[in-house]
């Protein structure tokens, strides 16, 4: 007897907009998808900003999209999680951060706040630094010093003065905190073991040695006169009465407030590792806190926001209930339907089979917009005929990968290819009396023109994505959904109760 499979097709980068210019989705000849929209229930889902745990107005991406779909709940990204905890007030009770506070109190020592002084939101956010300064004030810590790393990459190249003045005004108003050093991120945030760069930053922060200035702005302006933009500002020590304002010493507390790990590891190791061979330096006895987990092998470190383990993701829960599942995609999106869909877990669940179709070897995908969608489809049809699987997760990479090239005609061809493949799969699923859900993880190829400049746009969008429900017994769908609502919908079709960890809600009315 044939199983009634529940098949989720993720058309990567297939968003929806009413705009016609630069819209490869609406321009493509796609009889199958058009027919599905006429004949079957469909709705739109939020796939960007707060709907997927990102800051408001931030475009979605494939990692975040698959994480949210697979988790069946909004998965807050580090930036949003920390910002939310400040506004909710939990931040001020954070155990790791309060260890730094208690140590400074107990030893009458200094609290040092290190990180990228920027609203860029890629590695850090200036608002998180303000949260730390506020915490120090609330807990009555008197000696608070900022070691400010200057950005110039995720924000304009010479914009640091604005952020220095912003934080200095904030510290004056709140009544605690001073900037002790400034360093361009080129030195402070290396990630390629260029220890000679890191050492210059270390020397300023720990030894009080480097370029000298009477204020942070003075140090910055000197750098500008030497034609060095923010990123390349030489590590500089701010003096008070001819001496460094502050340097990291034994028994001090350090909080590194970058949330993205890759460029925060090296300086952390240089300051805090007991055994270190990057350059010669003394070992310090510190209370050292990192905003997120920079590396699981770091010792003597407290983590303020440790990684969350997502229990009962869709794949794990279906597996626990004895069901069989298949994940299938070509190379470009294989990690997304496996690792990210499973909440950042590499190991397959029990009863989870995986099929990887190699992506074509071309320089850019506009040269082969069909990619290997036909091979993915053929392989899936074969597997469906085995009548083994209760659930299938499939990704077509074309609308996203070809959308990124900015070549409109190629993106159109990509959509047409996917339409052909969707048609074949839907027919097979209906033949087996199964259900096909068709959606996307984020937008891209529906908006290939930057409307403000008229130039090609290669980025993702903040547009909603479709959700189509194809079966011999389709029911009505509600409006106002988001990606996290897909897993509960699929579970309903599989007659499985939703686990308590899933906070998404079924889209079926």
Swiss-Prot record:
Biological processes annotated in GO: glucose catabolic process; glycolytic process
Q: Mind naming one GO cellular-component term on file for this protein?
A: cytosol
Q: Which GO terms describe its molecular function?
A: manganese ion binding; phosphoglycerate mutase activity
Cofactor notes: Binds 2 manganese ions per subunit.
Query: Which positions are tagged coiled coil?
Result: none
Instruction: Give the reaction(s) catalysed.
Output: (2R)-2-phosphoglycerate = (2R)-3-phosphoglycerate
- Where does this protein hold substrate? 123, 153-154, 185, 191, 260-263, 333
Q: Where does the record place the catalytic residues?
A: 62 (phosphoserine intermediate)
Q: Which residues form the signal peptide?
A: none
What's in the keyword line of the UniProt record? Glycolysis, Isomerase, Manganese, Metal-binding
Could you name the domain of life of the organism this protein comes from? Bacteria
Q: Which CDD domains match?
A: iPGM
EC number annotated for this UniProt entry: 5.4.2.12
Statement: the UniProt record of this protein carries the keyword Manganese: yes
Q: Which cofactors, by name?
A: Mn(2+)
- Which InterPro entries does this one have? Alkaline_phosphatase_core_sf, BPG-indep_PGM_N, Metalloenzyme, PGAM_B_sf, Pgm_bpd_ind
One Pfam entry for this protein is iPGM_N
- Per UniProt, Mn(2+) 2 binds at 12, 62, 441-442
Task: Give residues annotated as binding Mn(2+) 1.
Answer: 400, 404, 460
The pathway noted for it is: Carbohydrate degradation; glycolysis; pyruvate from D-glyceraldehyde 3-phosphate: step 3/5
Q: State the family it belongs to.
A: Belongs to the BPG-independent phosphoglycerate mutase family.
Role, per record: Catalyzes the interconversion of 2-phosphoglycerate and 3-phosphoglycerate.
Subunit structure, as described in the record: Monomer.
What is the protein name stated in its UniProt record?
2,3-bisphosphoglycerate-independent phosphoglycerate mutase
Q: Which organism is it from?
A: Clostridium botulinum (strain Langeland / NCTC 10281 / Type F)
The organism's lineage?
Bacteria, Bacillati, Bacillota, Clostridia, Eubacteriales
Q: Which gene encodes it?
A: gpmI
């Amino acid at each position: 007897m044939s199983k009634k499979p529940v098949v989720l097709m993720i058309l990567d980068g297939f968003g929806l907009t009413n705009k016609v210019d630069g819209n490869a989705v609406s321009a493509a000849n796609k009889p199958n998808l058009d027919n599905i929209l006429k004949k079957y229930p469909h709705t739109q889902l939020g796939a960007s900003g707060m709907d997927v745990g990102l800051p408001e107005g931030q475009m979605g991406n494939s990692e975040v999209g698959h994480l949210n779909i697979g988790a069946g709940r909004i998965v807050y990204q580090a930036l949003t999680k920390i910002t939310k905890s400040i506004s909710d007030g939990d931040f001020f009770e954070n155990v790791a951060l309060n260890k730094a506070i208690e140590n400074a109190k107990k030893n009458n020592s200094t609290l040092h706040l290190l990180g990228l002084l920027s609203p860029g939101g890629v590695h850090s956010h200036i608002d998180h630094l303000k949260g730390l300064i506020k915490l120090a004030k609330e807990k009555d810590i008197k000696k608070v010093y900022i070691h400010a790393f200057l950005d110039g990459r995720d924000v304009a190249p010479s914009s640091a003065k604005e952020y220095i003045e912003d934080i200095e005004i904030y510290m004056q108003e709140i009544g605690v905190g001073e900037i002790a050093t400034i360093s361009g991120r080129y030195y402070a945030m290396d990630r390629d073991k260029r220890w000679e760069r890191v050492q210059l930053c270390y020397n300023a922060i720990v030894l009080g040695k480097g370029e000298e200035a009477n204020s942070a702005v003075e140090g910055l302006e000197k750098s500008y006169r030497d034609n060095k933009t923010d990123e390349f500002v030489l590590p500089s020590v701010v003096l008070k009465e001819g001496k460094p304002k502050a340097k990291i010493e034994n028994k001090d507390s350090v909080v590194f407030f970058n949330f993205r790990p890759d460029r925060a590891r090296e300086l952390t190791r240089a300051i805090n590792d007991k055994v270190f061979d990057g350059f010669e330096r003394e070992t310090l006895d510190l209370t050292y806190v990192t905003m997120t987990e920079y590396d699981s092998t770091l010792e003597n470190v407290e983590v303020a926001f440790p990684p969350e383990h997502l229990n009962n993701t869709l794949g794990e829960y279906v597996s626990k209930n004895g069901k069989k599942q298949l994940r299938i995609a070509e190379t470009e999106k294989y990690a997304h339907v496996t690792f990210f869909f499973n909440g950042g877990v590499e190991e397959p669940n029990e009863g989870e089979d995986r099929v990887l179709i190699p992506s074509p070897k071309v320089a850019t995908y506009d040269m082969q917009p069909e990619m290997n969608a036909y091979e993915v489809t053929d392989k899936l049809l074969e597997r469906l005929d085995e009548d083994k699987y209760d659930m299938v997760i499939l990704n077509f990479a074309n609308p996203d990968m070809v959308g990124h090239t900015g070549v409109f005609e190629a993106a159109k061809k990509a959509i047409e290819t996917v339409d052909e493949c969707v048609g074949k799969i839907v027919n097979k699923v209906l033949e087996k009396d199964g259900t096909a859900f068709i959606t996307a993880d984020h937008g891209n190829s529906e908006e290939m023109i930057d409307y403000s400049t008229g130039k090609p746009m290669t980025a993702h969008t903040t547009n909603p994505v479709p959700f189509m429900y194809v079966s011999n017994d389709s029911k009505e769908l509600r409006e106002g959904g988001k990606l996290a609502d897909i897993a509960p919908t699929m579970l309903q079709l599989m007659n499985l109760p939703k686990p308590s960890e899933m906070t998404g809600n079924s889209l079926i009315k």
